[in-house]
Amino acid sequence: MPKAAGDAKLLIQSLNKAYAATPTNLKIIDLYVVFAVVTALLQVVYMGIVGSFPFNSFLSGVLSCIGTAVLAVCHRIQVNKDNKEFKDLAPERAFADFVLCSLVLHLVIMNFLG
């Protein structure tokens, strides 16, 4: 086996080992982020195959997915116990921030639809 392949295998093993120690609530947020990004990619593939006639709808869908993923990543950063920057922030406050920002994002998206 080439050295680069061995290094890649060691890297993947160390990442899997580190991720196994991640708390369940952070893994759920990660799953939500992956779902939002995959949904955005599916919309882009659909637009490439079928077309983008109602372009506002396409943009709204993709921006909603990407915006939601970004907000979820920010929420993950805030609720991570290992992050010293947000140690004084209560998890309930972080979730309230996430919900409020999501509401504003989706109101803007709905306004963009017309």
From Swiss-Prot:
It is found in: Endoplasmic reticulum membrane. The keyword Endoplasmic reticulum applies. One of its GO terms (cellular component) is oligosaccharyltransferase complex. Pathway: Protein modification; protein glycosylation. It is a multi-pass membrane protein. The keyword Transmembrane helix applies. Pfam families: DAD (PF02109). The chain crosses the membrane at residues 31-51, 53-73, 94-114. Residues 1-30, 74-93 are cytoplasmic. One of its GO terms (biological process) is protein N-linked glycosylation. InterPro entries: DAD/Ost2 (IPR003038). Keywords: Apoptosis, Endoplasmic reticulum, Membrane, Transmembrane, Transmembrane helix. It comes from the Eukaryota. Residues 52 are lumenal. Subunit of the oligosaccharyl transferase (OST) complex that catalyzes the initial transfer of a defined glycan (Glc(3)Man(9)GlcNAc(2) in eukaryotes) from the lipid carrier dolichol-pyrophosphate to an asparagine residue within an Asn-X-Ser/Thr consensus motif in nascent polypeptide chains, the first step in protein N-glycosylation. N-glycosylation occurs cotranslationally and the complex associates with the Sec61 complex at the channel-forming translocon complex that mediates protein translocation across the endoplasmic reticulum (ER). All subunits are required for a maximal enzyme activity. Component of the oligosaccharyltransferase (OST) complex. Belongs to the DAD/OST2 family. This is Dolichyl-diphosphooligosaccharide--protein glycosyltransferase subunit DAD1. It comes from Hordeum vulgare (Barley).
